[in-house]
């Protein structure tokens, strides 16, 4: 089950613990009771997921499994944050706390609400045997969470303007030495407000606010817990070690890997504060002061202190590379300063006035980025990504463009680099390559979009960029490899509900249905069925699939195709024919009953469920006709 060590049973127990938290009779009484009630609605969902057979594994479902893991992890994180928040809010004393403390708790309610709504929105019901009653409960919970998000609105609420003015007494910090070091940072570091900003900040989704786990001043160990741990020994050490508060991003409460200073002098993890700003917030999250500008200045002093602290406590350093060293699998460190010097020299050549120098440098970086994760980390650390993005639009230099987009593809394999690529505004340039580049460049552009779209928030950005229409064009007219790359990217993008309508409007359905009847050696029925199975849950897509006369080829797939394809064909037919007696009669006349009965006996667990559901609907429609 996705989510690592967090099983459905343990999650049910967590929900029970949340519901057992004593009710609050103070300022946050309604917030606490509302959140606990919404969480309680999820019990039956987790129980049915627990009782469902796990989805079958196959090559075509690898991306879907990744998505499944993402939504489950989001749910786990959201529920754990909800428990911590309710425990904090119920013990909140207005008279003993500052206005800022109340605002932080209000901000946490907003963040936890968003996280839970996002997790439920990403749930794909067809992956599990979820009853209609439970679906209605989940949709009710989502509706309530969305309404709550609208109610919380701006963080500059006047709700706490009275009765909360007494200052919070500062506890003696166990990390005073660290704080003193930070306070001694020269003012020049804070005044670097003229540093160049990213030219194209990403249009992060308007409703997204990064999750604030717990913005209390207490250095408790609970906020260090991880839903999934890669190594039990390392996990045990982390649980027993309190990270200095100044090393944690005030928004995410995670150890910072790229600390950046805003105009108020506060430091945040760059990606989180960038998302905060992109959501339209004009104030500093911690101080609520208005930001004079949106320049994010690197805090190199704090980054160095974090590196030293990680080394001292034998903790893996965020970002994988700091101060010229990278951590090996055995826990030892390897010096990469020599490699870094060579890579920096190559990155400098990327901006050379000489076309030949640029071509040579980008070709070498392409080769290096293909070889190892260390190289991908170093190349990104050397600042190559923004320069490579500029090279994507090299006029008339096809070779440089091909190598640049391939470099970005290779770099995106490393998870942290995905974020840097998005922050560099790469999507717009990648889409331009996808539309007008050479075939090799278009293939690699499609593969890059797939890689970037593995992060849920990126699905939204890529979908809004015009990429889907360009991918559909490649799906129809590209090379064999280009078609497969386009299909993979389209499948992943269409997992997000908002992109399904875009794909239909871009004309995706007709080429997919055509692929079902293609008898050539380049047949892509597997890819077509996988994408159609994702689209079919959308009403606009469902109408388009029916208009494309997809039912006959789908029934053919039921009769003679591979097990995975038969499973997807049954799932699509169920979506198309549910609550439509006319369509049920049609598939019965076209010979669907016999292959469905075979599938209900011999298919995968998911295929059996879909086949049995269709057969039951066929029986009901037959009895209904007989009674007329």
Curated annotation (Swiss-Prot):
Record EC number: 2.3.2.27
PANTHER family for the chain: U BOX DOMAIN-CONTAINING, U-BOX DOMAIN-CONTAINING PROTEIN 10
GO biological process: protein autoubiquitination; protein destabilization; protein ubiquitination; regulation of jasmonic acid mediated signaling pathway
Cellular component GO terms, alphabetical: nucleus
Entries under InterPro entries matching the protein: ARM-like (IPR011989), ARM-type_fold (IPR016024), Armadillo (IPR000225), RING-Ubox_PUB (IPR045210), Ubox_domain (IPR003613), Znf_RING/FYVE/PHD (IPR013083)
ARM repeats: 373-413, 415-454, 456-495, 497-537, 539-578
U-box domain residues: 242-316
Protein known as: U-box domain-containing protein 10
Superkingdom, natural source: Eukaryota
Functional description taken from the UniProt entry: Functions as an E3 ubiquitin ligase.
PROSITE patterns cross-referenced by the UniProt entry: ARM_REPEAT (PS50176), U_BOX (PS51698)
Catalytic activity line of the entry: S-ubiquitinyl-[E2 ubiquitin-conjugating enzyme]-L-cysteine + [acceptor protein]-L-lysine = [E2 ubiquitin-conjugating enzyme]-L-cysteine + N(6)-ubiquitinyl-[acceptor protein]-L-lysine
Pfam family, one: U-box
Enzyme category, top tier: transferase
Keywords: Repeat, Transferase, Ubl conjugation pathway
Pathway(s): Protein modification; protein ubiquitination
MF annotations from Gene Ontology: ubiquitin-protein transferase activity
């Amino acid at each position: 089950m996705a989510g690592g060590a967090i099983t459905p049973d343990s999650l049910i127990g967590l929900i029970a613990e949340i519901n057992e938290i004593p009710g609050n009779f103070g300022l946050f009484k309604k917030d606490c009771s509302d959140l606990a009630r919404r969480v309680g609605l999820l019990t039956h969902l987790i129980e049915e997921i627990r009782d469902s057979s796990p989805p079958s594994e196959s090559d075509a479902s690898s991306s879907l499994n990744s998505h499944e893991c993402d939504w489950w992890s989001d749910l786990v994180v959201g529920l754990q944050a909800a428990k911590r928040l309710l425990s904090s809010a119920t013990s909140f004393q207005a008279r003993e706390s500052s206005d800022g403390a109340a605002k932080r708790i209000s901000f946490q309610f907003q963040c936890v609400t968003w996280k839970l709504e996002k997790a439920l929105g990403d749930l794909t019901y067809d992956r599990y045997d979820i009853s209609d009653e439970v679906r209605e409960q989940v949709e009710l919970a989502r509706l309530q969470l969305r309404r709550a998000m609208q109610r919380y609105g701006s963080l500059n609420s006047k709700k706490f303007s009275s009765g909360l003015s007494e200052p919070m007494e500062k506890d003696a910090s166990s990390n005073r030495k660290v704080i003193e070091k930070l306070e001694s940072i020269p003012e020049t570091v804070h005044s670097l407000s003229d540093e160049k900003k990213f030219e194209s900040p990403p249009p992060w989704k308007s409703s997204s606010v990064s999750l604030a786990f717990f913005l209390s001043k207490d250095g408790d160990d609970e906020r260090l817990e991880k839903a999934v741990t890669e190594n039990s020994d390392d996990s045990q050490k982390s649980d027993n070690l309190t990270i200095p508060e100044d090393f944690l991003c005030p928004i995410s409460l995670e150890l910072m890997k790229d600390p950046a200073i805003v105009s108020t002098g506060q430091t945040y993890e760059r990606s989180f504060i960038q998302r905060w700003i992109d959501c339209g917030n004009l104030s500093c999250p911690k101080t609520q002061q208005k930001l004079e500008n949106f320049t994010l200045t690197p805090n190199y002093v704090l980054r160095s202190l974090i590196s030293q602290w990680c080394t001292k406590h034998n903790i893996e350093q965020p970002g994988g590379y700091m101060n010229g060293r990278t951590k090996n699998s055995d826990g030892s460190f390897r010096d990469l300063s020599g490699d870094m010097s060579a890579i920096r020299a190559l990155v400098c050549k990327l901006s050379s006035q000489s076309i030949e120098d640029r071509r040579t440098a980008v070709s070498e970086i392409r080769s290096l980025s293909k070889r190892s994760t260390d190289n991908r980390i170093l190349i990104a650390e050397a600042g190559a990504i923004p320069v490579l993005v500029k090279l994507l639009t090299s006029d008339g230099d096809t070779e440089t463009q091909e190598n640049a987009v391939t470099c970005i593809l290779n770099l995106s394999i490393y998870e942290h680099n995905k974020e840097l690529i998005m922050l560099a505004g790469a999507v717009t340039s990648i889409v331009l390559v996808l539309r007008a580049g050479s075939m090799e460049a278009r293939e690699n552009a499609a593969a890059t979009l797939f890689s970037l779209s593995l992060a849920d928030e990126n699905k939204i950005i890529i979908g809004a960029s015009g990429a889907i229409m360009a991918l559909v064009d490649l799906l129809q007219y590209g090379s064999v490899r280009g078609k497969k790359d386009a299909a993979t990217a389209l499948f992943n993008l269409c997992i997000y509900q908002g992109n399904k309508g875009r794909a239909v409007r871009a004309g995706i359905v007709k080429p997919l249905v055509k692929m079902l009847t293609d008898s050539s050696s380049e047949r892509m029925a597997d890819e077509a069925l996988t994408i159609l199975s994702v689209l079919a849950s959308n009403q606009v897509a469902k109408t388009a699939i029916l208009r494309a006369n997809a039912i006959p080829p789908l029934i053919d797939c039921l009769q003679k195709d591979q097990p995975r394809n038969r499973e997807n064909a049954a799932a699509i037919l169920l979506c198309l024919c549910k609550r439509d007696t006319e369509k049920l009669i049609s598939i019965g006349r076209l010979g669907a009953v016999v292959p469905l009965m075979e599938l209900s006996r011999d298919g995968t667990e998911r295929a059996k469920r879909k086949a049995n559901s269709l057969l039951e609907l066929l029986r009901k429609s037959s009895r209904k006709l007989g009674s007329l």
